[in-house]
C-alpha cells in the first residue's frame, strides 16, 4: 500500500514533466510562409545529422491563381527523392537517405499570380528515445501517454492547418470572383452605353436624311 502511494505521485510528476517538455518542443516550432512570384523557384535546406533522423514535411498553397505548384526533394548526393507536379498541398515523412543537406524546392510554373505557400519542416522524435536510461515502469507509461497526446495534438494541428488553408483558398476565390464581376459589370455598362449612343446616332441620321429628301 505504501509502495502504491509513493508510485502514484511519481507517475504524475513524470507525466507532467514529459508533457511540459513536449509542449515546449512543439511551441518552438512554427510553419514558414514564402511567396512565389510567377515562374519562380524557392528552396529550403535541412541538415540530417544522423541516419536515424526523420523529418515531417508538409506544404499547402494559401493564395494565388489556381493554387498549383511543383515540389521536389533532393538528397545530399543530388538524387531526386520525390517530385510532384501541379499540387495544392501534400505531406511527407522523410526518412534519412544519408547524412547531409537536403533540398526542398517549390516552383510556381502555372499562371501569372503570386502564390503564398505555407511550409512545415519538423524533426520527428519519440520521447522514449530521449529517456532510454530510464527503465522505470512509471516513466515508460508516462512517456507512452505523452506520445499519444503528442500524436493527437499533431493530428489536430494538421487538421486545423488544412481547414485554414481551405479558408484562405476559398477567400481568394471569392475575391477573384468579385473582381471579375466588377470588371464584367463595367464592361456591360460600357457596351450598353455604346449601343445606346449608336442607336441615337442612327435614328438621328435616318430622320435627318428624310428631312433633306422632303425639302
From Swiss-Prot:
Residue intervals annotated with topology Cytoplasmic: 204-215
Signal sequence region: 1-25
Membrane topology: Single-pass type I membrane protein
PROSITE patterns: GOLD
Topological region Lumenal: 26-182
GO term, biological process aspect, one: protein retention in ER lumen
Primary location: endoplasmic reticulum
Entry GO CC: COPII-coated ER to Golgi transport vesicle; endoplasmic reticulum; endoplasmic reticulum membrane; endoplasmic reticulum-Golgi intermediate compartment; Golgi apparatus; Golgi-associated vesicle
Family annotation (SUPFAM superfamilies): Supernatant protein factor (SPF), C-terminal domain
More about this protein: Present with 26300 molecules/cell in log phase SD medium.
Subcellular location: Endoplasmic reticulum membrane
Lineage: Eukaryota, Fungi, Dikarya, Ascomycota, Saccharomycotina
Keyword list, A-Z: Endoplasmic reticulum, ER-Golgi transport, Membrane, Protein transport, Signal, Transmembrane, Transmembrane helix, Transport
Name of the gene: ERP2
Official protein name in the record: Protein ERP2
Domain GOLD: 41-123
